[in-house]
Amino acid sequence: MAEVEIILIRHGEAASSWGDDPDPGLSNLGKSQAEAVKENLESFTSQNFQLISSPKKRAIETAQPTSLDWRSEIKIDDAFSEIPASNIKLERRMEWLKSIMNMDIAMLPEDVKEWRSRIIEKLINIKSNSIIFSHFMVINVVVGYIKNHPILLSMYPDNGSLTKIKVSNGKISLIKIGDEKNTKINT
């Protein structure tokens, strides 16, 4: 089986927090970060990377400058959407997320376990080099899985950061962790 390179990109800064809006677009800073992502990806233009995005506005808006520059379609894939929390009231989401992030993976709610498994399964089955525009917790799932970390939270990916992984023979391995910052989590 061929080796596949995957670049995980955390979306640019959201216009509002996840606890205030279930699907915000990008802030002005986030739009600048999306442009910076496009520039950081220029060396990959000729390498036939497919562009994949979470269905959330902030991820799609982060992908758009690259998509336009490359004249490449963005494939929307809900496997790379944020942690499932539709049954959690907006005003409780941040509190809920903080408790979930530090919970032992075996103790996670079933919908979160299924979400985590689906991300890993999808990555293992990607057949071509891909750039995936996604979220804080999705990147944590992947890096935590690779490092066999016992809880969901394993890093603090910065907005617009690029984390590189490879998939070979059904195994995911880490090439490079993207820039991190200690930030208020706005998934």
Placement of each model-derived feature along the sequence:
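Active-site-proximal alpha-helix that buttresses catalytic centers in soluble enzyme cores
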Residues: 2-75, 99, 103, 107
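Acidic, low-complexity terminal tails and accessory targeting/binding regions
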Residues: 2-4, 72-76, 81-95, 125, ...
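Generic beta-sheet signal
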Residues: 6, 49, 126-137
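Active-site metal-binding loops of divalent metal-dependent hydrolases
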Residues: 12, 136, 180
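Conserved protein kinase catalytic core
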Residues: 16-17, 84-85, 141
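Short, conserved alpha-helical segments within structured domains
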Residues: 55-59, 79, 134-138
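Active-site signature of alpha/beta-hydrolase-fold catalytic machinery across serine-
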Residues: 65, 141, 145
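Internal catalytic-core helix/loop-beta-alpha segment
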Residues: 100-127
